[in-house]
Design a protein with these regions (language model features):
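Outer/extracellular conduits and scaffolds centered on Gram-negative outer-membrane beta-barrels
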Residues: 1-188
Length: 188
């Protein structure tokens, strides 16, 4: 497979695909990859850049033309078509630091122990956001209020609208790869 580095240079490297992330339906391609010379299990999917607005140029996205209110996926290779060739690294589940602290105290027949541990600098893929942040319609009623009330809606002519959430009815069902919209900081 071809791997595109951060500086934009494409290299031929061995890819090994990892595990799936889903909400009952499974993406056609795994969420993480193992790339020779890189850290293990990097999240591999589609980078997004907001929501398509009325008046935007709408590309083909996996064989269908995007509509206003859809999630805007970055065309990584610049060919004007959104497909699997536009996947890139979208997160790193490997922590920069792992830390811990253990404290024990004993006095006669009383003892107490406190343990703190955590990680810093890693990403997680929060599969709950696949449903909670998309108002897909009547079949998916368990969405966040923010995703519903701040979903994309058409504006008046000339009105500039910035929406964090896609239109009501936008679906991630059948999407072949996950997007960076479900990647979060996993530090604790």
């Amino acid at each position: 497979d071809v791997y595109k580095r951060q500086d934009g240079i494409a290299e031929e490297r061995r890819f090994y695909y990892g595990a799936q992330v889903s909400r009952g339906n499974i993406f056609k391609y795994p969420a993480n990859v193992f790339v020779e010379g890189e850290e293990t299990s990097l999240f591999y999917g589609l980078e997004t850049d907001g929501i398509y607005q009325t008046g935007d140029v709408l590309p083909d996205v996996f064989g269908s033309t995007a509509v206003p209110g859809d999630v805007k996926i970055v065309d990584q290779n610049g060919d004007g078509i959104i497909d699997l060739n536009d996947r890139t690294f979208i997160g790193n589940p490997n922590p920069d630091f792992i830390y811990g602290f253990n404290f024990n105290i004993n006095y006669k027949r009383f003892n107490a122990s406190i343990l703190f541990n955590g990680v810093f600098g890693n990403d997680i893929a929060n599969g709950n956001l696949l449903q909670l942040n998309n108002a897909e319609g009547l079949t998916y009623l368990n969405i966040s209020p923010d995703a519903y009330y701040n979903a994309w809606r058409p504006g008046n002519a000339g009105e500039i609208i910035y929406n964090e959430y896609p239109r009501i009815g936008y679906t991630t069902n059948g999407q072949p790869a996950m997007t960076d919209r479900i990647i979060e900081d996993g530090s604790y």
